Swiss-Prot record:
Signal peptide bounds: none
UniProt keyword annotation of Lipid metabolism present: no
UniProt organism field: Stutzerimonas stutzeri (strain A1501) (Pseudomonas stutzeri)
Identification of the protein by name: Cell division topological specificity factor
Biological processes, Gene Ontology terms: cell division; regulation of division septum assembly
UniProt xrefs under InterPro entries: MinE, MinE_sf
Summary of the function given for this chain in its UniProt record: Prevents the cell division inhibition by proteins MinC and MinD at internal division sites while permitting inhibition at polar sites. This ensures cell division at the proper site by restricting the formation of a division septum at the midpoint of the long axis of the cell.
Family: Belongs to the MinE family.
Transmembrane regions: none
């Protein structure tokens, strides 16, 4: 083994940090695939509550948002408990 082979071998080895990063990316991708709700659903619910609060006084726990997949389309269901007038 000459000096150049020593440096080439060193580049091929992955560092523990690179291995950990790759494993973490795989785990995160796997968990995202198994979740039933998309990433944007909590933010969407928060924004909807803010818009509704402009017109009606409600609590955030009175709003329920659900996303349902039905074959080729998705249905966004929004249930709001409105206060009595």
């Amino acid at each position: 083994m000459n000096l150049l082979d020593f440096f080439r071998e060193r580049k091929k080895k992955e560092t523990p940090a690179a291995i950990a990063k790759e494993r973490l990316q795989i785990i995160v991708a796997h968990e995202r695939g198994q979740r039933s709700e998309p990433d944007y659903l909590p933010a969407l619910q928060k924004e909807l509550v803010e818009v509704i609060r402009k017109y009606v006084n409600i609590d955030s726990d009175q709003v329920h948002v659900a996303l349902e997949d039905q074959g080729s389309c998705s249905i966004l269901e929004l249930n709001i408990t409105l206060p009595d007038r």
